[in-house]
Amino acid sequence: MYRSTKGASKARRDQINAEIRNLKELLPLAEADKVRLSYLHIMSLACIYTRKGVFFAGGTPLAGPTGLLSAQELEDIVAALPGFLLVFTAEGKLLYLSESVSEHLGHSMVDLVAQGDSIYDIIDPADHLTVRQQLTMPSALDADRLFRCRFNTSKSLRRQSSGNKLVLIRGRFHAHPPGAYWAGNPVFTAFCAPLEPRPRPGPGPGPGPGPASLFLAMFQSRHAKDLALLDVSESVLIYLGFERSELLCKSWYGLLHPEDLAQASSQHYRLLAESGDIQAEMVVRLQAKHGGWTWIYCMLYSEGPEGPFTANNYPISDTEAWSLRQQLNSEDTQAAYVLGTPAVLPSFSENVFSQEQCSNPLFTPSLGTPRSASFPRAPELGVISTPEELPQPSKELDFSYLPFPARPEPSLQADLSKDLVCTPPYTPHQPGGCAFLFSLHEPFQTHLPPPSSSLQEQLTPSTVTFSEQLTPSSATFPDPLTSSLQGQLTESSARSFEDQLTPCTSSFPDQLLPSTATFPEPLGSPAHEQLTPPSTAFQAHLNSPSQTFPEQLSPNPTKTYFAQEGCSFLYEKLPPSPSSPGNGDCTLLALAQLRGPLSVDVPLVPEGLLTPEASPVKQSFFHYTEKEQNEIDRLIQQISQLAQGVDRPFSAEAGTGGLEPLGGLEPLNPNLSLSGAGPPVLSLDLKPWKCQELDFLVDPDNLFLEETPVEDIFMDLSTPDPNGEWGSGDPEAEVPGGTLSPCNNLSPEDHSFLEDLATYETAFETGVSTFPYEGFADELHQLQSQVQDSFHEDGSGGEPTF
């Protein structure tokens, strides 16, 4: 093995550098670009051109004549395109980048490629995931893919446009040439069109087709500030089927799908409210002449502070529409989170146009435009001569004010079949009407109550909502901008908020929730009036038509009041939002209240029981029937009575009516020397117990309780002497009468029955004692089987322990 020396290392480096310089000379670049290339850039460009040469050399030769256009003519066509061509593999490795990229991104092709040989090196990191998803999405090779991403631009271009450039990419995968490398890396060819349109050359009357239509399906249109069509390119005939003359001076909102009105109006408002170089993007559906709907990716931008809007409309497929809409929604949510502003739909709350300015024929919607009957009167037409007369939107728009639709007057009820001649957002702010005039199609008119229906027909107990209870038919809501809103909420306005605002928006922002609606300050509201429950307040307002809205329900526009009753069920159906009440007035996702204590059914007997009687197990655990339980209780009572009679001395004078215990005996002195032959009697406080007749044990003809039977049963027990001495006396001498007890005449079967009763165990005791538990000691509750025959002086019995 040869040891490396300083001279040998320098020689190898010189050889490598010489080979790199040879590669630089082989690159098809201008000499000015070659001079400023570093060794790393040279090797990167060499890899790109090598992949390009291998791919195009191994591809399928083109069929047909190839001599129609020369190479120079092809280069001129590519340079004239409103975009640049891009070829890269599925893993992102670049194969080709047209020279026209310098006009759109500010970088030359050499500068962009010098950053790396992958497309991810020249794309904004925030869009890497979008591009990767599009490249890995499974589909046919000939299926077009359309997506948008941001390309890195030069410093000078970023200073002009304050950011990277948004580019719309449409391309497809091609069949790969033979080879293991190309089998796993199909080639994607795309045309990239910047979404920042270039100024149109020449003072032409309308937008021309442009070279972009050769690679991208699109048509251009110009709109007034109300989005009425001023001009449109002829290519609209291909995509929508309308002639150019059929769309001039028509409302753009008349072509929109009803579900896309909210998105279009919010972007339209943003263009009007914000100043500067603002562009709006939206994915909407436009109605074609044959009646179908076509997905359009629309890019709107303003030509000047007072000039009209220009729109680039790109027809897209359903899959592309879904992908673009998801991308736009995620970007809007991200921007709202960064800026700290809620992503809600704005609304106009002031008069944008006067009644005289609405007479321009540009505001007339096309046939089939939705209509509305929520406004008291139709606007009068005026004239708009120049764009300079169009008023600017106010910078102080109040979004907390929630207007309520008023009842249509008879003058408008007769003309419900006519189209209203206003398009949002330049709609006259009618008193009591919604901010935008989104007219309804015929199917949506079913939400409107008939003008001739009465209040009893419209308000039934099943249809009365919380919003109706809080807004009686006679309530007045003075408008802070116009005073004509007072006294407008009539009988036909007893609809829910959803029915009133359905044509305006597809989703309700937090400000439009029924329980958080804000109302303007009334001019004269009664004071010291309490908020009653909705069920009683609504009936009270029905009975008093002249009553105005209470002060508690009509705060100033800057405050928000939450109803204390009836709103918890509304919030339980809605997800919590940042503006949801959390101060105790309303309950967010309240849990059901559990009544009574919780109990757990234990399947086994708990361990560690001291005694069976102290067991906390429920009685239902053993599943006794009522009859069995009664029998057990009766047997326990009889056994306890027999045990009481055995442990306690009886009176010498036994009456014929039953057993009478001695209740006046004095306890024995424990210090006495007890040496008698008979068993001692413990000094216990005797309590009077009542005994039950045991007639069921003997023949009914014999009176069992006439004598004292206990002394006859226990013949061997001695009775204490009154002097305190024990002796073995004869029971006949001590018992008056000296007659034997009838118990001596019992049959052997009766004696056996009595013995069984004395040793009987209940089912509960048997079940518990059968299974000993851990920590369970029989000595804790078992009685002594033998009576002590002697006691010590200290009163203790038995043998000494030590």
Curated annotation (Swiss-Prot):
Keywords: Activator, Coiled coil, Differentiation, DNA-binding, Neurogenesis, Nucleus, Repeat, Transcription, Transcription regulation, Ubl conjugation. Residues 280-319 form the PAC domain. Ubiquitinated, leading to degradation by the proteosome. Residues 470-554 are annotated as: Disordered. GO terms for molecular function: DNA-binding transcription activator activity, RNA polymerase II-specific; DNA-binding transcription factor activity, RNA polymerase II-specific; protein heterodimerization activity; protein-containing complex binding; RNA polymerase II cis-regulatory region sequence-specific DNA binding; RNA polymerase II transcription regulatory region sequence-specific DNA binding. The keyword Nucleus applies. The keyword Nucleus applies. GO terms for cellular component: nucleoplasm; nucleus; postsynapse; transcription regulator complex. It holds the Pfam family bHLH_NPAS4. Induction: Induced upon calcium influx. Expression is regulated by neuronal activity (at protein level). Induced in CA3 region of the hippocampus after contextual learning. Induced following sensory input in newborn olfactory bulb interneurons. Induced in the medial prefrontal cortex cells of the brain following experiences with positive valence. Induced in pancreatic beta cells in response to calcium influx. Down-regulated by REST. Transcripts are regulated by a subset of miRNAs, such as miR-203, miR-224 and miR-744, that bind to its 3'-UTR region and down-regulate its expression. Residues 1-13 are annotated as: Basic motif. Mainly expressed in brain. Expressed in the limbic system and olfactory bulb. Specifically expressed in CA1 and CA3 region of the hippocampus after contextual learning (at protein level). Also expressed in pancreatic beta cells. Residues 470-495, 502-518, 532-554 have a biased composition (Polar residues). It is found in: Nucleus. PROSITE patterns: BHLH, PAS. CDD domains: bHLH-PAS_NPAS4_PASD10 (cd19697), PAS (cd00130). Residues 1-53 form the bHLH domain. Residues 14-53 are annotated as: Helix-loop-helix motif. Residues 5-38, 624-648 form a coiled coil. Its main location: nucleus. Transcription factor expressed in neurons of the brain that regulates the excitatory-inhibitory balance within neural circuits and is required for contextual memory in the hippocampus. Plays a key role in the structural and functional plasticity of neurons. PANTHER family: HYPOXIA-INDUCIBLE FACTOR 1 ALPHA, NEURONAL PAS DOMAIN-CONTAINING PROTEIN 4. Efficient DNA binding requires dimerization with another bHLH protein. Heterodimer; forms a heterodimer with ARNT, ARNT2 or BMAL1. This is Neuronal PAS domain-containing protein 4. It comes from Mus musculus. The gene is Npas4.
